[in-house]
Amino acid sequence: MLEAAFMTGLERNADIVHMATYAPLFAHVEGWQWRPDMIWFDNLNSVRTTSYYVQQLYAQNKGTNVLPLTMNKKNVTGAEGQNGLFASAVYDKDKNELIVKVANTSATIQPISLNFEGLKKQDVLSDGRCIKLRSIDLDKDNTLEQPFAIVPQETPVSIEGNVFTTELEPTTFAVYKFTKK
């Protein structure tokens, strides 16, 4: 989850951070130099790690414009009083979607309220979807024996007007997507 939290900062500062890279990408299960690695393999199999899925969620949910996102008038950077929450928001003008990414790095459930201010009066947000990546056990990862132990799960979500409220489970990375009609 810390990787997801870090990447909210990259996205919030997209005017300065133009690219990021991930290394090392591959690791053999019987011989590696360091962790983390994105994809583990042996002679017959490969497995995607949670790091892979975090990177994938960012790559598949990038926007064209970074939006301001604040909590108590401050960027959501896990600062004191923000309860381990890190977040970023983007607008994808090609898909007409508002996308909010939130990482809860704390060990407690956190209430979330997304208030989409500044929309035109005729703009209506459709019910959206949430894609979550989570594990209560911070030491758990996908393995060759359990390749799908931690994978993104998608669920529909409902929004009332321009406000979406929910609770985010501990050690969870969530991507919320709403289409502007």
Language model: regions and residue ranges:
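C-terminal catalytic subdomain
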Residues: 44-47, 58, 84, 93-106, ...
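Alpha-helix capping/termination and helix-coil
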Residues: 11-17, 59-66, 93-95, 106-110, ...
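C-terminal beta-sandwich/jelly-roll accessory domains of carbohydrate-active enzymes
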Residues: 74-84, 103-181
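A structural signal for short hydrophobic beta-strand segments in well-ordered beta-sheet cores
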Residues: 89-91, 157
